[in-house]
């Protein structure tokens, strides 16, 4: 490397560039007070305190000489205090130095900048990597400190200096999180002057930049230090205020500079001490974030974030963003006005589109806010955003409800009050959010200005700060030691907690304990304001202190826990946000912005708190724990964890004894905080996040060293996940506290909870957490919550080391006792709250495949308490009245994600029975189960507002509304083979005969007047020999032909039915009527897991779902619609039901939807076998597998599933299962589960997109409305928009008039067969009239083109399910488009025959036959096999073929017929079709025939409950060609003249009439007559 590096050259340039900032000061006294050494410990190892004094003095003398040489006489003394790299005695040329304390020894002469750097490089050229930030601090340092303090105080008294130098010597700098890892730690740890990033990191080495000036004794140091901090907005504080390059002021930092130049790291020595890789990575990181002012600092080996933290927005960006937000607000306002006008003027057809516009505009507005991550961690922003989501969800739901209503004008949702309320709510919420966002942007602009280090832009701000602070130089009282706080500092310092003046007694206590004081959470502003040196760092190898920093730590986290009274800002949420108030008032903090943002740790992801050692990404909340205060790198934590977590409790006691005074100040701060208004946003009690962080630090201090690692692991998000719980509880003895702290670190609760945990019993902690959670649940103003917090925290401050023994015993007891012993009685809150506590078992993590040790139970409880409160406060509270069995871990994971979806999904999860398995697995370990857990309900299927009912009533609502349900659970039978007698389906009313679909349709319409009279879509069951004709007698056969048949195999008693058939819907559409007559769907996985157990619960008989096998005698009298079903139900309770087996099967069923890997539930083909990879599986397993397949080779499975699932499950069931799976995984934090949620949603969109008109029911559409509403409320606007677009399409299709065929046109006698060519008509037509052209007048090519266009139009309308279902049961009404297409085929064939037979002249007939042959040739070239075969069937029909034709015509027709020769299974046609490229219109008749053969020849099940997917695979392959051809369109243009000539082919004769004409032309047995 060159001798003169960048740092050296820039240092030289700086001397001249910034000379105008230098000013001459008085000479130092003979023995200046020592300053922290810039590179290493204040004292060289082995050097006495006196030596150090001499060294410093000599250094100043030497530096004066150097500056004289460099800047001549103009600024002889302006640089004097800068260089601490050359400390040596007046009497010696060299300093005592070692590897950990490097004093550059140079000759006393020739102290030029060149010689200084040269000797420094030469001396350390061969040195190994040195620990810049973790030297081996001598143990005698305490003695040195005391001596130093004595000397300092002597000088203080002489010079009237209020600031002692004790911390200046013993405490290092705390840098702001400017550049990743640019600052070494403090002097006691890193030699005092660590250089922060050149952009805008701020070190508080010996003095903080812009502090109140130090005493006159140290004017050189203070003034030049201020000078350094001023120009670049950053202070590189050396031992004597030394700047970057040994006595030369730092170069003006440029934007994006790496922070090496002009700083300690700019030296060769420092560069060698850092790895090249880290250097490179850091530079790349800074290049990516050009204005990376407050990024997180890194330990060299700590995992770096994948993306650099965002730079604060420039003024132009802020202005542009503000204007953009205002534009969006105007757009939203205009859209809402239009929305209101549309409703007032009853133009409801445009309402869905208007809702879409509003949704898109709000999504666009939110994307602007997200650009600056304004709500990343802000509780206020989160709350405002949730309000917008909730209001928007209501508006979208209003639009969709109006769409679904039969008479839109009479929809109840359109009442003026409701519309006004919905619109006003949304408008207010949007304005509130935008106002907050604009305020945050302005604060960020101020923040960027104050902290900006680019160029000299920060000089003015720093100078202003300096000027404001230097107003009261002597305000502090001499002799107060570490804790002295100047008036200016207390007035200008921004902390999370209000500044509290210390009493003399407190000062004495703190001074006595300042040997290892709590490290303050130094935000950048607090460092600017700090008039006293920060506390010194702890010494290594002490029982109460962790080991020193690792060598690679380049920036010391400033988000460390500290006491407020020390003058150290413990702010975490506000430290990085520029306060809008004047500096003198900034410590009060804008109460409506920062202080109440419990998790608003960093407005722009570049907050000081990102420096927490455990913070693994800029997106995490600040966790100001003691380990970050002690600057542990993650590597050191991991290495020392094994030793530290086994340390004895006496160490904890000693630490408690030393730090109890800190708790006094904390409690005082908390008491003061009670006056602070708070915000409860999104269910989070919002208090300044810094308070939680500080409290966390106290708890960490109390819990000892071993906690550092576990605490680090437990904060992936605001609430820890089960996985993180496991990590933390297994790592240390104090895991309960660490997990607890971390789980609540998002809010003020963390302070009280963690403190009480540190010095109190776990049961006390539980009560506190419950109390806090309870108070938060019942108040929206968090001030009372804060009061609770204060109470609990203040009760702990009186504990001393004697309480530590109690804590030890309780902790040890806690790790050995069962959770049941620890669980205190919960306050009688809502059922929802109680239901949560039931799952506070060690095994609760099973649902997430995680294991939680019993030692973490208390912390687990705490998180659940808080989560319970979160759920209570959730904006979707009205969706959430069904308590569910989700574990706290899931809820915690949900907390860091979207709020609403987990509510409905969780309820769905519970309702679906998935958690019942979990319940019963751990039932023996928990308190008695709540009855509500047995009602497995899907919250997102709710139609009625949950909030209008009491919990007891509402918990059964969805099942109670299923009274008239005819069948229960399509999957219960699909898990394992079992007899029908043991199936819960036996409790259902009897099914109808398999084939009588029209009658079933009629009865289903009668079943409930609230149901839409739409065509049912369920495939018919296959014939069953033992099933009685009326469906109410006989046992079903053990063979299950279809799933639908299985569902219909319910047994009823002979005397149960007042009518032969119960009013049921089609199979698998499990409809039930509640007492008010409303009908809802209850599907597949809703069977209660413990329904057998519930059957004995007489107290819950009210509103009991019919799926529960219980006699309904005690129930209220059912409505007329449900009475027949109830009568059936009373007598169908089975005799031999194994309850455990049933519950186990239901659990197994549900868990398939909740498992990521379901391969074990599938039957895969063997290597030697042919066919699909998946031969069969349970229904849920097939659904999950269809959502998971990603490979191209496996994609066919997904396509086959989507194509054929209607043959074994209802579309509404599939949608319900997919929404359940999505919402289950949506709340999980694991990547694979998030991926599963995305895959599930993709499949859901595919399924909805493929819904046909016959699939659509009001229940299915209502389900989609509810799910879209939940997506909007959870903030998934893009997904909601995607799904809603499909929904609008389907509603339009649903409302279209349904045409089932051309029966009227065919005179009621037309029939469509499998071949599609049979037909008869009673309409005799006449030849075209008037000006109509004749067939011969038109060109054959044009006729063929128009025929093809007509065919293609009908062909593209055919839905694939129609073809499958028609082949299965030949139900024409289920396949309207297929019906239309085949009838078009028939009419064309009859029209061609009629055209020929109506001609009396044989030559004319021959001309027409030749014309049709030409048309057929063109059709063949166009790949229109449908019209081709229609005309061929006409020419080859009996009435025409029997006539005499020329030999050429006969042979040509015969050759055409070879194409559809049936002798070899239509081999010729199949081969021709295989060689055909789209566009093509195939002959549908052959497809229907093939599908019929596959259906008849293959079973639906491989075994009971296991779907035979090979059969569906064959069906899919048959239909695949048809799907392929539907994608392409013909390029022809419509010719209306020819279309009118066709006249829809209505002009045809009937079969009988054509025979009569044919026989007239050629009588039987005679030659044809030419008439």
From Swiss-Prot:
Biased composition (Polar residues): 74-83, 287-297, 620-631, 708-718, 851-866
Pfam families, alphabetized: RasGEF (PF00617), RasGEF_N (PF00618)
Biased composition (Gly residues): 230-248
Residues covered by the Ras-GEF domain: 1339-1564
Record-listed Phosphothreonine modification sites: 524
Region annotated Disordered, chain positions: 28-85, 202-271, 287-316, 513-580, 614-646, 695-719, 728-747, 776-868, 879-898, 1013-1038
A GO term from the CC aspect: plasma membrane
Keywords: Developmental protein, Guanine-nucleotide releasing factor, Phosphoprotein, SH3-binding
InterPro entries: Ras-like_GEF, Ras-like_Gua-exchang_fac_N, Ras_G-nucl-exch_fac_CS, Ras_GEF_dom_sf, RASGEF_cat_dom, RASGEF_cat_dom_sf
GO biological process, one term: sarcomere organization
Source organism, top-level taxon: Eukaryota
Basic residues composition bias: residue spans: 55-73, 298-309
Function: Guanine nucleotide-releasing protein that binds to SH3 domain of Crk. Transduces signals from Crk to activate RAS. Also involved in MAPK activation.
Protein name according to UniProt: Guanine nucleotide-releasing factor 2
Species assigned in the record: Drosophila melanogaster
Lineage, highest ranks first: Eukaryota, Metazoa, Ecdysozoa, Arthropoda, Hexapoda
Gene: C3G
